[in-house]
Amino acid sequence: MAFAHHAEAAQSSIVSGSAPGFAAGVTGGGDATPVYPTTIDELKEYLTSSSPQNIVIEGTFDFVGSEGTKTYQACNIYDCTPDNGGQAILNTLGGCGDTSTYDVTIDVAGYQGINVASDKTLVGKGTGAVLNGKGLRFVGVSNIIIQNIEITNLNPKYVWGGDALTFSDTNQIWIDHVTTSSLGRQHYSFGQESDNAITISNSFINGKTDYSATCDGHTYWGLELVGSSDQITFYKNYVYYTSGRSPALSGNTLFHAVNSVWADNSGHAIEGTDNGMGLFEGNVFNNVPTIVQSGFVGQLFSSESANLSQCETSLGRDCVTNAYTSSGSFSYDDDGFFVDFENLPIVSAASASSIASTVPSDAGNTLSST
């Protein structure tokens, strides 16, 4: 699809800061007069409208039950069931195979997110702006800012029960200070269509869950990145209590992870197939015994002391080393994909030690002054 150019529109004053990394220049609703929805219907109307919108929300917008319920077939394919801390899988894509199925009832609102239209800014006022039981979808759209909200409670008992943030065929989207928790499936799901100029920053992937596919209170469903030519800056995020897909780096995704913290992972962090490409610098891995799953076939650069200067040509500076505490090895020096960074806006990187404590405390919907 063709995307409009938005450089002429100023970013609204309701937004804190400006997008770092690949999404630099995003303006969202631009200079549109802010609107303040008080009901879920008003919020959906503004998010899906054809005109630019600057949307400010405060408090909890509770979608649970708003679209009714629906019965699906499900099965238990994991070692634990929802009754003892596990997840069942909805048989929507035939994932149950020959395993016996049974009827379950899910909340329809959580199953699929709101289809956000182009040229939108959504900002939470204070630290309590929550979408309870509803995610957000970005499909064939551009120029969007989402800041200072939490998305939670998307049919967490059931795999395929709901993704927090879904992207497909998009351009210039900035996700900032967003908390995601208690989900049926992915915190971030990038489809096979290209997603360009994406930045996820200052956000909290809270994987602690009552319903775990790995039966240990950790979510397996972190970030699924399978786009044909995605560009994602991952800056100052806190990835906590996951057991896999953190990220699943596949497709032809260019993933620049800078000054983020991975903590308390019970399985593995990075996995992937195909030609996923990841540059990791200035990050902290704390209690992540397996950083990269065995058999990863993409390209990774882990910014070791001996190879930092390899970044100079494409990034305009040396890379910054990562830091490790009670974690496994992470030693990769694939740099053949560095040419893909040329002419892209590159975020600066601080030392890992300087962000080790600030990122976990600042990430998520923590902006009290918005």
Swiss-Prot record:
What's its catalytic activity?
Eliminative cleavage of (1->4)-alpha-D-galacturonan methyl ester to give oligosaccharides with 4-deoxy-6-O-methyl-alpha-D-galact-4-enuronosyl groups at their non-reducing ends
**Predominant location:** secreted
For this UniProt record, give its keywords in alphabetical order, as a comma-separated list: Carbohydrate metabolism, Cell wall biogenesis/degradation, Disulfide bond, Glycoprotein, Lyase, Polysaccharide degradation, Secreted, Signal
Glycosylation annotated at which residues?
N307
Name the Gene Ontology biological process terms: cell wall organization; pectin catabolic process
Q: Where is the active site?
A: R245
Please tell me whether the keyword Disulfide bond is annotated for this protein.
Answer: yes
Pfam families, per database record: Pectate_lyase_4
Report the EC code(s) recorded for this entry: 4.2.2.10
Listed GO MF terms = pectate lyase activity; pectin lyase activity
Q: What does this protein do?
A: Pectinolytic enzymes consist of four classes of enzymes: pectin lyase, polygalacturonase, pectin methylesterase and rhamnogalacturonase. Among pectinolytic enzymes, pectin lyase is the most important in depolymerization of pectin, since it cleaves internal glycosidic bonds of highly methylated pectins.
Q: Which PANTHER family does the UniProt entry name for this protein?
A: PECTATE LYASE 18-RELATED, PECTIN LYASE A-RELATED
Q: Which family does it belong to?
A: Belongs to the polysaccharide lyase 1 family.
Q: Under what name is this protein listed?
A: Probable pectin lyase E
Q: Which organism is it from?
A: Aspergillus niger
As recorded in Swiss-Prot or TrEMBL, the protein's gene is named pelE
